[in-house]
């Protein structure tokens, strides 16, 4: 079958603020016995791929992009990597893009509409946002990215439910609904949601996104990095004493 006759490859964008549990969810997707194979693109803020080190040794291909958000300087790399993956599309059933916790997901999603080759070969299946139920109020207060991650979500995994009371959980859901009244919310502890709840959902709704961001398809975005967030990375050849 020719490339033009093939069905588009479904893409899941996995996002969530730092520490919310998105890498734990990715590990679940990669290791459960569901019979599917995924190509995984992991973006990490900083030069060292910390998240890639946390991903378990699964029989998947991991493409890691460092030193810049997918939504900014790495967008070109994302298009290049996706184009390269299409040459090996018979080796996987879907693509998962795990963004850095500092990313606004809107420009990531734009990638699948502004590049003609990527648009033909792929289909954005869902934006899945993992939310830390315990710390969400603080994140909403100090991070515009955390709000955008919720606003653009098709599916929200409300994680770390074991750390909050029912009253606190209800208040968190109320805060989420004020930002995004449409997304499906799945409560979880340690990101323990069924894989079928986040993969193969055909949940991305372009019309809803255009209502929020009329210029979404223009390929232009006002996203800026948080200037207060920086990363410093270094490698050592011996254990570090955290008390010194």
Give the ranges of each region predicted by the language model.
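Conserved beta-strand/loop subsegment of P-loop NTPase cores
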Residues: 39-40, 94-96, 120-132, 150-161, ...
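Short glycine-centered, acidic/aromatic-flanked micro-motifs in structured strand/loop junctions
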Residues: 16, 99, 159-160, 236
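Short, conserved catalytic or adaptor-binding loops enriched in Gly and charged residues
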Residues: 55-56, 64, 149, 176-178
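C-terminal accessory "lid"/substrate-recognition subdomains
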Residues: 2-3, 148, 155, 164-244
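Flexible active-site lid/hinge loop adjacent to a nucleotide/diphosphate
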Residues: 137-152, 158
């Amino acid at each position: 079958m020719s490339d033009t006759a093939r069905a588009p490859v479904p893409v899941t964008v996995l996002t969530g603020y730092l520490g919310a549990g998105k890498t734990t969810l990715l590990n679940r997707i990669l290791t459960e016995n569901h019979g599917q194979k995924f190509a995984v693109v992991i973006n990490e803020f900083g030069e060292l791929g910390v998240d890639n080190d946390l991903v378990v040794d699964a029989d998947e291909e991991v493409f890691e992009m460092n030193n810049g958000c997918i939504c900014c300087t790495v967008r070109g790399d994302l298009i290049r990597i996706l184009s390269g993956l299409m040459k090996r599309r018979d080796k996987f059933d879907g693509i998962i893009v795990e963004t850095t916790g500092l990313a606004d997901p809107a420009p990531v999603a734009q990638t699948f509409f502004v590049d003609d080759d990527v648009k033909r070969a792929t289909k954005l299946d869902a934006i899945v946002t993992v939310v830390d139920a315990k710390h969400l109020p603080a994140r909403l207060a100090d991070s515009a990215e955390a709000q955008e991650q919720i606003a653009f979500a098709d599916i929200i995994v409300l994680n770390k439910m074991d750390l909050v009371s029912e009253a606190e959980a209800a208040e968190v859901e109320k805060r989420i609904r004020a930002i995004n009244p449409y997304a499906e919310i799945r409560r979880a502890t340690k990101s323990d949601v069924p894989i079928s709840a986040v993969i193969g959902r055909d949940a991305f709704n372009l019309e809803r996104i255009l209502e929020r961001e009329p210029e979404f398809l223009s390929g232009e975005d006002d996203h800026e990095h948080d200037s207060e967030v920086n990363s410093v990375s270094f490698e050592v050849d011996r254990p570090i004493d955290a008390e010194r």
